[in-house]
């Protein structure tokens, strides 16, 4: 049988070739760099560029869908404003990152030969802007989740106040560590100030704690959404209304946000992949928040078109707003008994 052409280039032991060193003349003299190190460096650059390109495409597609399919009334809602701002900030950061990756700052001569004058001034400015945009993205995402927690807990003022305080504390903690990490990175870029020597699994401790706190914040908010929506769905099932509607749509997205960010954070924190992987947690959350509302709106319109006249007796009016909140009101008929009313109060 005829062998493929690449079989002619197979050697029994290729370890000497794989682990060979390349001599690079730098401004401090000649240095030996393993080929495997250069391969890993270029692979990281390629994977990061692919990830950022995917984030940019997702962000542009999502913002177009949100602007075209959202009503003018909903565009004035604070949740819409924060969601749109987070998507725009994410797209802007992706563009700046892509320009930086394609510049001379990632050249082998710059990183191993230390010829830093090859890096243009705009690259340094873009690097600082990238660091400044990170807290903006975190802030807009956290504010969006906090507002939605207040909305979904609006039926109980005490619960709403407690959840708002917890959400605000998480937001402040997450922002504090992200801003601390941002300041350290900017000081290093401008004045080569050494980063903190204390590291956790290879990351600087402010960055690692910021990532863990952000993932925990997402899990907390998604857990609140999932619990409230699941409880509302059970109530609707008890009163005989169980179509696949906006509540189920948002519940699916909430459960996805409950699981996926934690998984990505664990992978990125303890299994070192590549530089661009850490931004996937933010990207998935930012994309999921507006998409859940669009999906719920579409499903609500379908249910509205299929709506038929209500049965005689107790009329249950289910008013579902697609900003992760719901109202269930019971309108009693003439023969509505007091015992039935007390039973209904347990559902609401």
UniProtKB/Swiss-Prot annotation:
GO terms for molecular function: mating-type factor pheromone receptor activity; mating-type P-factor pheromone receptor activity. Keywords: G-protein coupled receptor, Membrane, Pheromone response, Receptor, Transducer, Transmembrane, Transmembrane helix. GO terms for biological process: pheromone-dependent signal transduction involved in conjugation with cellular fusion; positive regulation of conjugation with cellular fusion; positive regulation of pheromone response MAPK cascade. It is found in: Membrane. It is a multi-pass membrane protein. Its main location: membrane. GO terms for cellular component: cell cortex; cell division site; cell tip; fungal-type vacuole; G protein-coupled receptor homodimeric complex; mating projection membrane; plasma membrane; plasma membrane of cell tip. The chain crosses the membrane at residues 46-69, 79-103, 125-141, 162-180, 207-225, 249-267, 283-301. It comes from the Eukaryota. Belongs to the G-protein coupled receptor 4 family. PANTHER family: PHEROMONE ALPHA FACTOR RECEPTOR (PTHR28009:SF1). Receptor for the peptide pheromone P-factor, a mating factor of S.pombe. Pheromone signaling is essential for initiation of meiosis in S.pombe; P-factor signaling alone may be sufficient. This is Pheromone P-factor receptor.
């Amino acid at each position: 049988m005829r062998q493929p052409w690449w079989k002619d280039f197979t050697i029994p032991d290729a370890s000497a070739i794989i682990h060979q060193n390349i001599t690079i003349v730098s401004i401090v003299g000649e240095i030996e760099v393993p080929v495997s190190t250069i391969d890993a460096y270029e692979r990281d650059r390629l994977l990061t560029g692919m990830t950022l390109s995917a984030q940019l495409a997702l962000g542009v597609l999502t913002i177009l869908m949100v602007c075209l399919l959202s009503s003018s009334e909903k565009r004035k809602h604070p949740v819409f404003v924060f969601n749109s701002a987070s998507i725009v900030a994410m797209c802007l950061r992706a563009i700046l990152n892509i320009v930086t990756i394609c510049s001379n700052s990632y050249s082998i001569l710059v990183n191993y030969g230390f010829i830093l004058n090859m890096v243009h001034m705009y690259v340094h400015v873009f690097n600082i802007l990238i660091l400044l945009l990170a807290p903006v993205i975190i802030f807009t995402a956290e504010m969006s989740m906090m507002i939605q927690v207040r909305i979904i807990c609006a039926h109980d003022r005490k619960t709403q106040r407690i959840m708002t305080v917890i959400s605000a504390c998480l937001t402040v903690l997450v922002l504090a560590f992200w801003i601390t990490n941002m300041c350290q990175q900017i000081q290093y870029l401008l004045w080569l100030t050494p980063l903190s020597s204390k590291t956790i699994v290879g990351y600087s401790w402010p960055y690692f704690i910021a990532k863990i706190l952000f993932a925990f914040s997402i899990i907390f908010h998604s857990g609140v959404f999932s619990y409230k929506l699941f409880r509302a769905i059970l109530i609707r099932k008890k009163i005989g209304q169980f179509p696949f509607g906006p509540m189920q749509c948002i519940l699916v997205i909430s459960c996805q946000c409950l699981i996926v960010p934690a998984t990505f954070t664990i992978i990125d924190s303890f299994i070192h992949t590549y530089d661009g992987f850490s931004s996937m947690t933010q990207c998935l959350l930012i994309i999921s928040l507006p998409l859940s509302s669009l999906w719920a709106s579409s499903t609500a319109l379908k249910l509205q078109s299929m709506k038929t006249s209500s049965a005689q007796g107790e009329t249950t009016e289910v008013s579902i707003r697609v900003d992760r909140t719901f109202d269930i009101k019971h309108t009693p008929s003439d023969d509505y008994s007091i015992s039935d009313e007390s039973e209904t109060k347990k559902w609401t």
